Amino acid sequence: SRNPAKLLPGAYDPCLEGGASRTLRFSVSATPFSDANALSRPESFGFILTNPEGIYSYNKKMILRGNEYIAEDGETMLWDGKGTTVTVTAYAPYADVVDGSVAVSCPSNQATASELSAADFVLWKGSVNPSTDLSDGKIQLRLGHLNTRLIVKLTLDGAPVVTSKVASLSVGGLKAEGKCDLSADSPVVV
């Protein structure tokens, strides 16, 4: 990646010319699994920007400082001056990416709203053209869930059980960890 703050005095970088050569700014929201009608702002998230030209590509942990997201390492990230369409992947909670994949896990007990929100894994992946796709100069990231649905049909002696009569249910033997291949066109957790 390139950073104008790291250029030597008098140095010239032709990729820093043009209207698109400006600092990346973010507007980020996520819908928590515990309340599909609410929006939240994660305290941190993983951000991967892949530029097909190889320059101005980033893989960062973003943290919320005040009302702005910044790279945890303090690097100023820029769009390239050409306005190149890039692939952006954003996910929360943050975890290190290993070989293009991120480990995902969920707590075994999700009985309360806080336990349920601890199970959140939200993701957004798509193409962004900095010349046309920014709103107020910011990249808009609306992180959504990779949903997993477990359907349990309860029977007692072969007859269906009315679920309103079930006060509590425990299911054992489920795998609570997986990996999400962020390099896939449509990432899924397996």
Q: What residues fall within each predicted segment?
A:
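Sec-type signal peptide cleavage vicinity
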Residues: S1-V190
